[in-house]
Every structure is written in C-alpha cells, then in structure tokens.
Amino acid sequence: MIAVFSLIAAALAVGSLVLLPVVLRGGCLLVVTIVWLWQILHFWHWRRLGVPFVPAAPFVGNVWNLLRGACCFGDQFRELYESKEAAGRAFVGIDVLHNHALLLRDPALIKRIMVEDFAQFSSRFETTDPTCDTMGSQNLFFSKYETWRETHKIFAPFFAAGKVRNMYGLLENIGQKLEEHMEQKLSGRDSMELEVKQLCALFTTDIIASLAFGIEAHSLQNPEAEFRRMCIEVNDPRPKRLLHLFTMFFFPRLSHRVGTHLYSEEYERFMRKSMDYVLSQRAESGENRHDLIDIFLQLKRTEPAESIIHRPDFFAAQAAFLLLAGFDTSSSTITFALYELAKNTTIQDRLRTELRAALQSSQDRQLSCDTVTGLVYLRQVVDEVLRLYPPTAFLDRCCNSRTGYDLSPWNGGSPFKLRAGTPVYISVLGIHRDAQYWPNPEVFDPERFSAEQRQQHHPMTYLPFGAGPRGCIGTLLGQLEIKVGLLHILNHFRVEVCERTLPEMRFDPKAFVLTAHNGTYLRFVKNSL
C-alpha cells in the first residue's frame, strides 16, 4: 500500500513539474492583463469627467516623445497644444506620465488662473525636498508659495527699473570685454566662423558672476575658468541628477523619499564657498557695486532674527539660481537673435542703422542705459526673438484650493471642478506660434511689435517671461543683458550664415530652456559702425 501511495505522489510531482510553466505563463498573463486594464481605466480619467482630452498611451501618457529624447519640453507641449483634440477648446485634459493635468489654451482662462485667481494657483507643480535640498528649495522658481512670497518681497526692489539702471555700468564693462574677445578671435582676418551659443554663454556667465557674486569670472578670457566650469556642471546630465530632476518634475510627491537635489554636490559646495568668501570680503572692504551682494549685506544688517534670510543656504540659493537661470536664458536668446539677423539681412541692416545713428549722436560713442532702452527697433527685434523662441517654452501651476476650482463655464457648460493638487500647463511656444494670434507665426517679423501693432495684440498671448505675480522677476535685467550683448557684437561685426548654419532651427531635446540643438554656427564679418 505504501508503495502505491509513493507511486501516486511521484506521478503528481511529475505532473506538477510539467504544469508549472503553464501556471507561470498563466499567472504572468493574468498580471499583465490586470495592469493593462488598470492603465486603461487610469487614462479614462478625463473621459469619465466629461472633459475633452488628448488620448494617452499606457504607462507614458502624452509625453512619449519627450521621454524617448525626440523633442524638448517646449516641443512636446506645443504638439499637444496643436493636437486636433485641443482645437477650439479652452483647455484639454492630458496625462504627463501618470499625472492627470490640464493644458490651458484660452487666453482669458490663462489670465484667470495666472493673474486674477492667483491665490488658488500660487505654486508650481514641480518641487524639491526642502529638508534635504536647502539650496534648491529656496529659490524663486521652485519654492512653494509661503517661501516664494517672502523671498519675492525681499528681492523685488533689486530688479526694479532704478536698480537695473545702476547695474548698466557692470553690463557695459563686460560688453567691452566681449568686443575684445571677438577681436582676439578674429586675429587680423576679415571674417570668422563661430559657434554662437558658446560665445554668448561666456558673455552671460561673466555678467551673472559680476551681478550675483560681485566677482570677475574671466570666462571670456579663459573659457576653462572655474566659474564657467560650474555653469557647465549645473547642466551636466549625470544619471543621479537626471533621476532627481525626473522625480521633481514628474513625481514631486516622491521628492522627500528620494531626497532630491536641484544641483550637484560639487555645484552646491562651490556656491557655498563662493558666497561665504564674497560676503566676508565685501563686508570688510565696504565697496558698493550695485549688485546682489550689496542687497545681501543690507539684509543681514536690517532683517530681524526670525527673517527667512537667516535660513541655511538662503543667500547661496538665490545666487545659485540666478546663475542657472540668467546665463542660459539670455545666451540662448542672443544666439537666436543673431541666427535670425543673419538670415534676414534687411532687418539686420535696419537695426545696425539705428545703432549707428545712436553712436554718432552720443558722447565718445558711449551709449547710456536710457539710450539703449530707448532704441525702438532694437526693442522690436528682441521682442520678436522672444516670441519666436521663448526661453521658458511652457509654464505650469498647481491647483492649491482645497475645494478645487470650478471650470464649468469653460467646459461648454458641463459641470467640472478641477481637483486640488492637479497641475495645469501653458504652452508658451504653442501660443506664440498660433496663427490665430500671430499671422504667419513662423516668420521673423519685428514689425509685429511696432507701436501700432502692439495695440492689436491679444492679452495673454505674449508670455516670454510668464505672467502674474510669479512671472519672471528679472525681466528688465534680462532684456537689458540681451540688448547689451547684441549691441557690442553688431557694433563691429556683420552676421552672416555659413555652410554649417542650419536652414531651420532645431531645439535640444535634453535642455529645459529652449536651446539650439548641436550648436549654431554663423560667420562674423568685420564691419565696424
């Protein structure tokens, strides 16, 4: 009897081994089916709410092209803005990976959310961990509303028109060094070909180093200088940093668990060391340079002990982000401007004629800040460059109203309330190239910004510096920086296309700020005004 049972047990064991692969395959198929159905239900979110939406792919939502490196943030949101599902809609539902979000399209609705109802959309969706990342979480871009409000109140006077005018001397000094750098590059020749973004990045790095740190970075004289190396370091796509950025932008609720950092450890050490040194040195010397360090020292003397400025890394956080945001956005804008001027010689000739007249009527051929800001056609050119190539090609906010936000009037009358915590996005690039607001939007035409045509612009369709209370605090400084760079280049050079110039501009898919892909090469011909 025992032998019989042993034979039966052996047979069952053999049968189990035979059936095991079948069971495993069946189990895997069941799991895959459940996950797939869950994905389908997840991405039916907008359908269930009766909201128009762009169909999403399982697991990746509507950002597959961005994730696979086929396009940048700006191009991805423009693609969604121009999708057939979004046409004629005030807003459309999208999915950024697993995050349900809205893409706003109607300028009146954009104004409501960015300006009129700012209190209900006062923070951005992306965030970093304030406990681990004391430097990244305190700057004006990433900070949540309470921190942003205090920081903005402190630094808004630094970027006011009068303060920016006082900084003009620092900008003009570096502009002269830009001219010297280009003359050295020319080496007695009649013309030269240069990669423009690199040239402009050296110029803007030296400007931000002077304004934010009160030091001379000497990037134009030595492109391998430490300060310039740190500007490259902050954009270095190392795996660990990419993971942190990915979490901050797509899964901000996990920032605390991951311990995200906006900057690399090396960049943070450099910022702390530089800030401590400069503050100590300036306090001893008593020098007044009309820069950010002057503001820091004044705050240390006047702000009470409970002020936000006494938090760890507060000053370093502001200077670090000014460097990150200031050098890249302005250098890209100058690059795009030179690219368009090289392709549109009639516009370049008119701009250089305006500059020549201003130089001839000025004392010692030196232009004052008021003269530069008063150059009408230069302003039109810069404004049109910022329309065609907005540095920040998309904007975002997060609904922070606990009771949600009623969007029924914008949903064709159908009831719909946006849930708390839901992000909303605005495709600045999409709006700026929408033929509904800008006829022939792909054409570079500074006349769009003539005094007559400005009056015809639709409100909230020109957003290169954002809008509302959380719009770019450094708008005036950024515009002046761009103008000074262009003037010092066009003062001595005519810009032309060369064999390596791309016929159509393509954007770097790895860059957050709108940046030319694989460089922008132009010919600079010696032709002083």
Curated annotation (Swiss-Prot):
Topology in the lipid bilayer is annotated as: Peripheral membrane protein
What are the record's GO terms for cellular component? endoplasmic reticulum membrane
GO BP terms: namely: insecticide catabolic process; response to DDT
Q: Which residues does the record give as heme binding sites?
A: 472
Give the record's keywords alphabetically.
Answer: Endoplasmic reticulum, Heme, Iron, Membrane, Metal-binding, Microsome, Monooxygenase, Oxidoreductase
Q: What are its E.C. numbers?
A: 1.14.-.-
The record's CDD domains line, in alphabetical order, gives: CYP6-like
A Pfam family (short name) is: p450
Chief subcellular location equals: endoplasmic reticulum
* Top-level lineage group: Eukaryota
Q: Where in the cell is it found?
A: Endoplasmic reticulum membrane; Microsome membrane
Cofactor entry: heme
Keyword Methyltransferase belongs to the record = no
Q: Does the keyword DNA-binding apply?
A: no
Enumerate the GO terms in the molecular function aspect. Answer: heme binding; iron ion binding; monooxygenase activity; oxidoreductase activity, acting on paired donors, with incorporation or reduction of molecular oxygen
What PANTHER family does its record include?
CYTOCHROME P450, CYTOCHROME P450 6G1-RELATED
Give the family from UniProt.
Belongs to the cytochrome P450 family.
* Protein function: May be involved in the metabolism of insect hormones and in the breakdown of synthetic insecticides.
What's the protein called, per UniProt?
A: Probable cytochrome P450 6t1
Name of the gene encoding the protein in the UniProt record: Cyp6t1
